[in-house]
């Protein structure tokens, strides 16, 4: 069920007089007090039989004669968004979860007492009606009401601006109001739900089992990020909100589940930006007996199908530019990408640590920071890529063959020393996915963990901890495996043409209100 565009209806709430909100609230509280005196103020005995969206889809094009020939009885409820009071008959536009529909309210049909009460009702009130479908003289599908009830009194006025909430932060802070008045916002989150359902259907169709792994970790792992720290009182131990589920999911591969995935929250105690929220949704999946090449093909198909299911097409428009997910995704190495968008760099320069350090200073990069203390050519190449090429990757592009020093959990290449079988997928200049052939050599993994600990001891807060239990799991033997993580929020941004990650998170984190 989806909302239909109706030229006879506003896309948001009707404007309310520019009065002081406190005065309006006081007046509405007085009305509520009167209602309480008359009986149950918030009844819960009305059950709708229809939704506005279904009625609009099925009956909007019918003529009045057809509706008279076969009367359609309905019971429907929703929020009153428009109200036009006249003499013996009035109109109200009511919005439910699917669309809007007009009520035609005649004093003779509902009775004088109910009609008098209706005149006092306010925009935002939750109302219910029983009646028969009809067409007005202007051809608008309406409910000729025979029974009218107030189910919930709205004490606060809806935004007075015709276009809803004008302040962007207020939209995020009071998402419940934004959802009431903005069809665009409602459509965004419906698309998100469709995308999530598509991902799950695709995974199930390819033999993956959905699992749930811990949100509280004794050791943070699976990504280079700063964790949130908490304390478990019963166990009297420090714990961390998970930054990634990776190491637990790979333990399941060790245990014999050959294809697993999880869609859930990750938490990273880092900055907020149009692309970053400290609490975000990820999908990670792992498949035994696959590698990063298989993963790239699979991820491409997965994202393409999600676009079709959520948007109806794989050819999208994002921020005014076409984005074609139907075409094969590009594949470039880090150095190839740098030289494509910054062709002044030679192969020799990109292999020269001293040159790269000097070049990065031109981009205001502090190469004396802790994370660069023992940085090799791979780390420096990656930073140069981020500065010169990343934002240019508008079309879907897999950046492949990452250096081992920035890929502590990825399997090394059998043919390219110092390189791993890893990729990151970029679309519209943003990272959408990260995947690789998994490192299943326990001794190699232990050594990489030790190097991460050295970086952490040197001051790199995002370096990984040593996870002895994960090493123990690998020592039981993990089959060759490929694994990938997809940022759901960023994917939904693409599918809904949303410029800010907060636009696709129902309740994003904000600073406290003053």
UniProtKB/Swiss-Prot annotation:
It is found in: Cytoplasm. Its EC number is 6.1.1.6. PROSITE patterns: AA_TRNA_LIGASE_II (PS50862). Binds 3 Mg(2+) ions per subunit. Keywords: Aminoacyl-tRNA synthetase, ATP-binding, Cytoplasm, Ligase, Magnesium, Metal-binding, Nucleotide-binding, Protein biosynthesis. Residues 1-22 are annotated as: Disordered. One of its GO terms (biological process) is lysyl-tRNA aminoacylation. Mg(2+) 2 binds at residue 431. Residues 1-13 have a biased composition (Polar residues). PANTHER family: LYSINE--TRNA LIGASE, CHLOROPLASTIC_MITOCHONDRIAL, LYSYL-TRNA SYNTHETASE. This is Lysine--tRNA ligase. It comes from Ralstonia pickettii (strain 12J). The lineage of its organism: Bacteria, Pseudomonadati, Pseudomonadota, Betaproteobacteria, Burkholderiales. The gene is lysS.
């Amino acid at each position: 069920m989806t909302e239909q565009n109706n030229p006879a209806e506003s896309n948001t709430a009707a404007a309310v007089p520019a009065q002081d909100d406190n005065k309006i609230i006081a007046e509405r509280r007085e009305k509520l007090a009167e209602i309480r005196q008359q009986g149950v103020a918030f009844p819960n005995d009305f059950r709708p039989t229809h939704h506005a969206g279904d009625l609009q889809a099925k009956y909007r094009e019918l003529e009045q004669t057809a509706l008279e020939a076969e009367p359609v009885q309905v019971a429907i409820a929703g929020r009153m968004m428009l109200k036009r009071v006249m003499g013996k008959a009035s109109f109200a536009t009511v919005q439910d979860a699917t669309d809007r529909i007009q009520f035609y309210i005649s004093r003779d049909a509902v009775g004088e007492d109910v009609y008098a009460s209706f005149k006092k009702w306010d925009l935002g009130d939750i109302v219910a009606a029983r009646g028969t479908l009809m067409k007005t003289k202007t051809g608008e599908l309406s409910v000729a009401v025979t029974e009218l009830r107030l189910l919930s009194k709205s004490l606060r006025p809806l935004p007075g601006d015709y276009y809803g909430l004008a302040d962007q932060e207020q939209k995020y802070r009071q998402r419940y109001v934004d959802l009431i008045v903005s069809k665009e916002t409602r459509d965004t989150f419906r698309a998100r739900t469709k995308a999530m359902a598509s991902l799950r259907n695709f995974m199930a169709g390819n033999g993956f089992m959905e699992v749930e792994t811990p949100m509280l970790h004794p050791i943070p792992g699976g990504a280079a990020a700063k964790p949130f720290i908490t304390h478990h009182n019963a166990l009297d131990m420090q714990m961390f909100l998970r930054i990634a589920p990776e190491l637990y999911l790979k333990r399941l591969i060790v245990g014999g589940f050959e294809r697993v995935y999880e869609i859930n929250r990750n938490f990273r105690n880092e900055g907020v930006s149009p692309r970053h929220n400290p609490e975000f949704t990820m999908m990670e999946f792992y498949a035994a007996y696959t590698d990063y090449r298989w993963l790239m093909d699979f991820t491409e198909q997965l994202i393409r199908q999600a676009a079709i299911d959520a948007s109806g097409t794989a050819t999208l428009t994002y921020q005014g530019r076409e984005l074609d997910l139907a075409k094969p995704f590009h594949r470039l190495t880090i150095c190839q990408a740098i030289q494509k968008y910054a062709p002044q760099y030679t192969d020799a320069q990109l292999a020269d640590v001293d040159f790269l350090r000097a070049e990065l200073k031109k981009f205001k990069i502090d190469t004396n920071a802790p994370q660069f203390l023992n940085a090799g050519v791979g780390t420096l190449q990656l930073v140069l890529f981020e500065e010169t090429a990343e934002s240019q990757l508008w079309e879907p592009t897999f950046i492949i063959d990452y250096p081992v020093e920035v890929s502590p959990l990825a399997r090394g290449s059998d043919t390219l020393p110092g390189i791993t079988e890893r990729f990151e997928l970029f679309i519209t200049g943003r990272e959408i996915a990260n995947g690789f052939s998994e490192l299943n050599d326990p001794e190699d993994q232990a050594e990489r963990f030790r190097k991460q600990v050295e970086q952490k001891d040197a001051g790199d807060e995002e370096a990984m901890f040593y996870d002895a239990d994960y090493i123990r799991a690998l020592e039981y033997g993990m089959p060759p495996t490929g694994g990938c993580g997809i940022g759901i929020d960023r994917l939904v941004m693409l599918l809904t043409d949303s410029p800010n990650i907060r636009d696709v998170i129902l309740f994003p984190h904000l600073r406290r209100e003053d």
